[in-house]
Swiss-Prot record:
Acts as a regulatory subunit of the 26S proteasome which is involved in the ATP-dependent degradation of ubiquitinated proteins. Keywords: Proteasome. SUPFAM superfamilies: Winged helix' DNA-binding domain. This is 26S proteasome non-ATPase regulatory subunit 6. Pfam families: PCI, RPN7, RPN7_PSMD6_C. It comes from the Eukaryota. Residues 193-361 form the PCI domain. The gene is RPN7. GO terms for cellular component: proteasome complex. One of its GO terms (biological process) is proteasome-mediated ubiquitin-dependent protein catabolic process. It comes from Oryza sativa subsp. japonica.
Amino acid sequence: MDGGVGEEGKQQPHLVLAHKLFLLSHPDVDDLAKVDLRADVLAAVKSDDMASLYESLGAGGVLETDAALLAEMRGRIEEEIRKLDEKIADAEENLGESEVREAHLAKSLYFIRVGEKEKALEQLKVTEGKTVAVGQKMDLVFHTLQIGFFYMDFDLISKSIDKAKKLFEEGGDWERKNRLKVYEGLYCMATRNFKKAASLFLDSISTFTTYELFPYDTFIFYTVLTSVISLDRVSLKAKVVDAPEILAVIGKVPHLSEFLNSLYNCQYKSFFAAFSGLTEQIKLDRYLQPHFRYYMREVRTVVYSQFLESYKSVTMEAMASAFGVTVDFIDLELSRFIAAGKLHCKIDKVACVLETNRPDARNAFYQATIKQGDFLLNRIQKLSRVIDL
C-alpha cells in the first residue's frame, strides 16, 4: 500500500521486527522469552530476505549465521533487482511517466523490504524525481520516516518531518497532514520532548489512521503518559480524563485507567500501585525505555506537587500515609526533589513537617518584573557609557 498506510490494527512488519530486536537485547526479558523472540526474528528475516540484517545479527551473536542461507538470500535479491531493473527499462522505453514512476517505486519498496537502508533511501530519491503529485511525494516521505524509526535514525526522521511540512505548503490533504502529526509526536516522545508529543497526539485522537506505526491502544498509552506530565489539571480533565476516544480504549491497557484517574482524583495509594504496574511497560517500550528514569522523576514531581499544593504545612507521616509508603522513603524522595529545584518546600527535620514555600502567581510576576528591570537598567548603563565615549 502506497505511503505505508496501515490497515486498522496492521502494524508495519519491520517495526514489529524492530521491537522484537529491541526486546532480544533487553536485560529484563527472560531467556525463555528470548528463545521465542529469536525464532520470530529469524522467521521475519528469512521471509523478507533481509540478508544484510541477518549477517549483522550473526556478527553480533544474536542469531547463528548459516552461510548457505545467506548465499540463497543474496542470490534471490540479485535476481529480483535484475527483474525490477528490466521493468524500469521497459517502462522507460515503451510506457508513460506514471508507469516509469511505479517501476521505480517498486524497486524502492523492495530495497526497504530486504533492509537495504542506503539503497532504499537512494532509490526513494530517484522515485521522487519521477513524482509530480504532492500526495505521492508525501507517501515517499512516510516510507522514509518508517525507515528512520526502524533504525532509530533521528537525524533522518527530523529532516523528513521538515521536508513533509514544506511539501504541505504546496498543498496536501488533511488525512496525510493528520498522519504526519502522529509521526512527529512519536519523534518528539522518542527525543524527550513530551510536551510537544502530548499536544500532537491529542490533536490526532479523533483522526488517527496511523496503524502502520502502532495499534490505537498503544497510541492512547503514549497520549496518556505524555499528557500526565505536560498538562495542568484543567486541561488534563478536559482533554484526557473525559475524552470519549480515550475512555473507549483506556481499559485495554493494564493499569492505565487507574494511573490517570487516581492521579486526577488525588487517590495517591492507588496511583502508586498503578504507576508501579506501568513501569514494566515503559521499560519494555523501545521509544520510552531510554527516558525511563527521566519519566519516573517527572511523574513523581507532578504527583508530589499536586499533593503539596493543598497544604501550607503537612506532617511527613500524613504524606507517607497518603502514598502508602514509609516516612523514610518520603524523606529521601523529597530531599532529592527539593535539592534539584523540582519542589517548592522545605523539610523541618525536628518537627517532621513539610512547609511549602512555592511562589504564588503575583510573587512570580513581581520577581520577573524586577529581573527584567535589572536587565533593562544594565543595558541603559552600557549604552550611556558608549555614548560618553
